[in-house]
Amino acid sequence: MRIDKFLQSVGLVKRRVLATDMCNVGAVWLNGSCAKASKEVKAGDTISLHYLKGIEEYTILQIPALKNVPRKDTHLYIAPKTKE
């Protein structure tokens, strides 16, 4: 699944266009490198979202089969990375 579609599907961003724009300006990182919107993601990958307020990191647990994941089921697909 493309990273922009994944971000929208699990609810980290509201619209896929916004996810694409974030990738274009370098605000989305995948496994430590800047990711283009078309980059494929898989279970076990780490996503970093660079916001003005700071960086949020998530680990992908599995790829959703549904177009949109209900908010109550988001924890099945991503897990926030803990700070050490």
UniProtKB/Swiss-Prot annotation:
InterPro entries in alphabetical order: RqcP, S4_RNA-bd, S4_RNA-bd_sf
Gene3D superfamilies on file: RNA-binding S4 domain
PROSITE patterns per the UniProt record, alphabetical: S4 (PS50889)
CDD domains hit by this protein: S4
Domain of life of the organism encoding this protein: Bacteria
Role: Key component of the ribosome quality control system (RQC), a ribosome-associated complex that mediates the extraction of incompletely synthesized nascent chains from stalled ribosomes and their subsequent degradation. RqcH recruits Ala-charged tRNA, and with RqcP directs the elongation of stalled nascent chains on 50S ribosomal subunits, leading to non-templated C-terminal alanine extensions (Ala tail). The Ala tail promotes nascent chain degradation. RqcP is associated with the translocation-like movement of the peptidyl-tRNA from the A-site into the P-site.
Subunit structure: Associates with stalled 50S ribosomal subunits. Binds to RqcH, 23S rRNA and the P-site tRNA. Does not require RqcH for association with 50S subunits.
Similarity comment: family membership: Belongs to the RqcP family.
Name used for this protein in its record: RQC P-site tRNA stabilizing factor
Organism: Helicobacter pylori (strain ATCC 700392 / 26695)
